[in-house]
Amino acid sequence: MIYALSIDWLALFCTSESGRINQYQHYWGYKLHAHGTRQYQELITVTLHGEDFLEVQQIPCSSILQPRSLIIKVCNRFLYSRGMWYCLNSFLDAHKIQVLNISRVDICADFNKFHNGLHPITLIKQFLSSELRHIGRGIGNAHFNHFAKKEGKYSKSYLNYTGLNFGSNESAARAYLYNKSFELLTVKDKPYIRQLWKESGLTDTKDVNVWRLEISIKSKGMAFKDKDTGEKYQIDKEKLTDTCEIATIFHTFARSLFSFIKNREGITNVTREPRIQLFNGEPYLNRCVLESVSGGNRTERILIKQLWQMSDTYRGNEIVEDEGIAKMVAVKLASATGLTNWLIKKRDLWDTPTRK
């Protein structure tokens, strides 16, 4: 099986002494947008040699976010450039920016067929007809387009399956299988991706398409435990510069999010069933979610709420003087457990006094 691995999305959570990028560094170009984002007041596109290189979000809208923090996203074309890491590190060093963690990374494998010639459409059809059973996350969607084809005097409707995904926008990680050739043809063509396919020996024609299995990992999914060793594994910038580490990360998440077994009768323990081999048997880690960083932990949500509302709960007591400290602890706890967005949504409601 021939496939090409790549990073298709990379966003870094960073900090600097000033909390802003220095737009007087003349090696790069800077374009300030007329609007910011939901979480940051300013959005700046950084250009390199006249092409969009980075998108920088700066100046937090809320005190919940870390002061002087920035989010730096690498523009898609540069992710496929061999000199991407050199250019990115040069920018970070010149602006004295420190990377704290990865906000999001998408790692993809592009191929024509799975291991042993299994066609992606065959996999999708077998799953939808219950011939195959998915192991793991139950939320998912199938994607298709339908068309009519004339047969004699009549026309017949057909379905063309274009994708299958597991997970949701709220998930720490999700997997998405889709027809990348079809997307480039119908949404936006990207010649640099087609060049990657050509260099990798993939076929991209009208009859033979390139498919992509995309693993999208958010900040709360960057840390996990390897069941076999008991050790914690943390996805960071350094690991993403190593092609072997990238492959390990991809196959680890692909195994935990996009695995199938034959759906036979009498299955009592799915973990003992042989899995359908999709790739070439590359090394992977036996991923286990760390409880301490689980965004769905009810106890953590209750504790964050109690800390945030401390001044209202204990009004009239000396403890109210420590309201700022309590909120700071709540913010740090939310950040450590992947609940920052949840806290941002709740804080306005919590800041409304419940008693007069």
Task: Locate each region found by the language model.
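Structured, helix-rich domain cores that form ligand/interaction pockets
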Residues: 1-294, 314-356
